[in-house]
Amino acid sequence: MSLPGLNFSTTETNTTESTHTIDLKPETEWRYEVAIGGTLHVTLKSGTAEIFGTELPPNKELSIQGKGSIYTWQGCQFVYTAIAGPKGLMSDYTTEDTPHMTMAINLHFALEKMRNEAEQKPKDVAGPRVLIAGPPNSGKTSLAKILLAYATKCDRKPIYISLDPTSVNLGPPGGVHAVQITDLLDVETYGGFGSSEISGPQKLQPLILLSKYFGLEKTTDNFKLFKRSVAQLAVPVLSKLAHDVEAQKSGLIIDTPRVPGNQNKTIEVNLLTDVVSDFGVNVIVVIGNDRLYADLMKKYPVGASGPTVVKVPAFACMDDDESYNRDAQQQEIQQYFYGDAKDMKLGPRIVTVDFSTLHVYKIKPSTQFDDDKADMLERVAEANILPNTVLTVMHAVPGSSEKEILDSEVQGYLHVTEVDEEKNKVKILTPVPGRLPSQVMLLGDTRYHE
């Protein structure tokens, strides 16, 4: 049996295929798609190659998950083996159609020029603050990774902003995140960025995340709350830039959320203009969307004050699909609690707590609002809706106002495994032993089934 459109066999599991050798000509790319639960083992034998801008070390095996590509500027040879997961092996192909890489490195050089110019000016003059916009599957995150990786090669320390609440590049879904990139991106993690300190000791510098929780799957499910979450994330980011000259000159790379194609385009433009205002964006990169580019050019015409808007061709990448994204979210939650498949095993704990001691609030879609002043949170009165949910622990105390809860930072995540309605008890999977760090939690759309 095969998964539709992916050509993955689902009958073989946990088997190792023979080793394959790939020879890439200069400026060519090998694209791969590993089924969720599978692993690709790659060793660079000669030449140079990179995964989204991060160079592969020679003669060292890397364990890779998800979708991506290996690109070479000068030619290379590598070997790989694939270990099947529960949904099969992988698909792969080589292509010489790689104009996106030339575009990416030219864009990097332009941003680096802006950084050099900013360094010659007063410390409050910002380096490039780049917003990457485009439709789903246009390659926004791929381009962001390349720009971040190339910046670190120049000893820069840019801040990456992820505004897609469905993404699992930096942790479980539902949040918007900011993280300063101070080391190589870790291509062995699922998202390709790295792991946070919660995962234990790291081979590379751990990511120190700043997160605000949105909780719903679509930005348009509660546009008011999403814009609030982004604005609240911008406050500490701008404070960091104001007090850290190195970060100020290195700048920002902002990865914008996906907006469904059937949504009113005015919504997307309004969202992007809010992000521009919140973070002081001075460069907008539009990927493969003439209409969005035209709309933004009307907002920010050439010669006027405001960001520079540039359009680049669609970035080559593997298409996403709903089933794959769902599986990826489940895998990321599993790895958050249990560690990755290679060498980072974690020991989560099950704790039983009285539901009456918890302050769990459900995030309401905007369709439930009676007016603009309506509450966005609703206290969960019964525990029976909690099995298989993921609760987001907030840096707040019982009795906090809705504003205080929504403005607080994310401390971590818990998984409700079981509810005893008669005793009003809940069993919770926690990533670390000991007491819960907070009793104030938010319930969004994310579910997890072990």
UniProtKB/Swiss-Prot annotation:
UniProt main location, coarse: nucleus
Its keywords, alphabetically, are:
ATP-binding, mRNA processing, Nucleotide-binding, Nucleus
Q: Which GO terms describe its cellular component?
A: mRNA cleavage factor complex; nucleus
Q: Does the keyword Hydrolase apply?
A: no
**Pfam families (alphabetical):** Clp1 (PF06807), CLP1_N (PF16573), CLP1_P (PF16575)
- Tell me where it resides: Nucleus
Provide the binding site for ATP: E29, K67, N137, S138, G139, K140, T141, S142
Protein function: Required for endonucleolytic cleavage during polyadenylation-dependent pre-mRNA 3'-end formation.
The molecule here is called mRNA cleavage and polyadenylation factor CLP1
**Species of the source:** Yarrowia lipolytica (strain CLIB 122 / E 150)
Lineage from the top down? Eukaryota, Fungi, Dikarya, Ascomycota, Saccharomycotina
Its gene is CLP1
